Amino acid sequence: IGDADIVHTDTEKSHANIEAGVRAILAAGAVPVVIGGDHSVNIPCINAFDGQEPFHLVQIDAHLDFVDERHGVRYGHGNPMRRAAEKPYVTGLSQVGIRNVSSTARDGYEDARSMGSDIVSVRQFRKMGVDAMLDRIPEGARYYVTIDIDGFDPSIAAGTGTPSHGGFLYYEVLEFLDGLTRRGNIVGAVSYTHLTLPTT
């Protein structure tokens, strides 16, 4: 349906415009694929699923994005997974690739786990392998997938404002997503890309 109207000085209005667009896509019986913005775009995208069947959220990211509030902000790029976990139709979260632990305090990790999150680092993912990771995700569920570009290693995706070494390589994520599509249905996909282009 094209771009959502983004008002750079008004996050609330921008989020309302994104939510309206995603609701229109869902009403048409299509799968919303949302590209761009910062990771807060997940908040309105997930809000748009209110009234839909429940889903399991799969996040590929370097950061947990589970801060409840920071400097008075509850709907920014550090909050979307916390806001998602509060929704009754989000049955659980698989947070995969998490490695930049400085972005969320210890209590954020404890809160995430207590609210149904399975947190897996890149090192843990590689040690267990794709199949074992997939086995940790409920089979036959509806999946909402969100990918932050910093989930990838900066050697292949340097154009992020928050590069974090030790990230995923392209084919690791591709194989994981391929396996996920064989376990259940993808009902939404959000990819966060920064404004700067990857360098070569």
Question: Language-model segments: which ranges?
Answer:
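Metal-dependent C-N hydrolase catalytic cores
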Residues: 1-56, 103, 119-121, 126-137, ...
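Active-site glycine-rich loop that binds ribose-phosphate moieties when present
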Residues: 17, 41, 64-67, 72-85, ...
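Short beta-strand segments
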Residues: 34-36, 59-61, 95-97, 146-150, ...
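Short glycine-enriched, charge-decorated loop/helix-capping segments at active-site entrances
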Residues: 70-73, 158-166
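Active-site rim beta-loop-alpha module in soluble metabolic enzymes
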Residues: 94-157
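Gly/Ser/Thr-rich active-site loops/lids in small-molecule metabolic enzymes
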Residues: 164-176
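Conserved small/polar residues in nucleotide/adenosyl-binding loops
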Residues: 193-199
